């Protein structure tokens, strides 16, 4: 999911390289990484394998940077095992890493190919997280739509959610700028 809503988010593409040297060699973004993903120390210690992926976030449409194809973020050697840890005990789970660090996307899950390979499950003895993952996948964001300004009734409906002081504690609310003086007065008076 794009952190920038609307059409701006449609400019984003996420590319994921699996732990496969052939896929890595053919991947458009291989020069942004030192080596192909493989098996993390965490998975190796549990006798599991092939849990690492590389993730890049790209300004595919050029709307964010002005240049199509600009790599915005890189996440090397992150794991698809949900319990993956680095040597210092911090998480190395791809979903956690992306969600904590990305300025452009929020990762809600894995596609069906990765889910079928065990993405999002814990690393257990004998797990091989890469069966069938033979090429990089690109996920281009779509369906974002720009919205117009909120109407007076939409603003009032939103503020109504905060009216019961016994249910919701709010110190203050700020009225948005409205298109006309009459609308502004209506919103301010409702507060």
Indicate where each model-derived feature is located.
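Surface-exposed assembly/interface segments
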Residues: 1-191
């Amino acid at each position: 999911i794009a952190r920038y809503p609307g059409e701006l988010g449609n400019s984003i593409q996420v590319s994921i390289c699996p732990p496969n040297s052939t896929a890595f060699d053919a991947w458009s973004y291989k020069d942004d990484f030192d080596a192909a993903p493989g098996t993390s120390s965490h998975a190796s210690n549990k006798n599991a394998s092939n849990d690492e992926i590389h993730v890049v976030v790209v300004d595919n449409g050029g709307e964010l940077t002005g240049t199509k194809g600009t790599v915005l973020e890189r996440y090397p050697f992150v794991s698809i095992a949900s319990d993956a840890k680095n040597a210092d005990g911090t998480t190395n789970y791809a979903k956690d890493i992306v969600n904590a660090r990305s300025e452009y996307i929020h990762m809600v899950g894995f596609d069906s190919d990765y889910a079928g390979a065990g993405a999002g499950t814990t690393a257990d003895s004998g797990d091989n997280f890469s069966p069938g993952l033979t090429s990089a996948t690109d996920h281009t964001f779509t369906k974002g739509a720009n919205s117009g300004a909120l109407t007076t009734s939409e603003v009032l409906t939103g503020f109504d959610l905060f009216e019961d002081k016994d249910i919701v504690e709010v110190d203050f609310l700020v009225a948005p700028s409205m298109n006309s003086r009459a609308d502004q007065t209506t919103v301010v008076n409702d507060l």
